[in-house]
């Protein structure tokens, strides 16, 4: 699974200059955010930017009676318009997900996986482009694209990552697919971290320490 864990800390403080309304998001730290959790997203409500909590992982209405269906944590940019689950959301149900960085697992020649933390080169908060829906739960899915540059050393996929000044363009775009397809991710850096992050129940700042 691509982009299945990330870290976000002091999200209220870090977004205070861009958010107009905070709908119940607390300024807590989450160093091991994982799918199904209730996590902060930012979306437009008319002309204002609102931050609220949604569950990570879309469950389409057509799958609600399928007991073995796995929530869709990621949405591939290349096939967004081909998938009925996502094609109806891209026009008006776009959001961004604030993050300090995300975890990815690198596989060595023996098939063993080692976790890495990937972040902005200047330690700035960034934002995953995402889609949301209001179904039985409030849910979102992170949009991913082909990895480029040094990130390919870790994984062949990565989130579509926005800088703060790009949020409005994405959320307000009249042609969001053109925006996403022409978008260039910011420069990122990465380093290996300890295996404590493998356990979703672990949630402490030391998860970010280099291995």
Where are the language model's segments positioned?
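Short linear sequence motif anchored by a di-proline
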Residues: 1-211
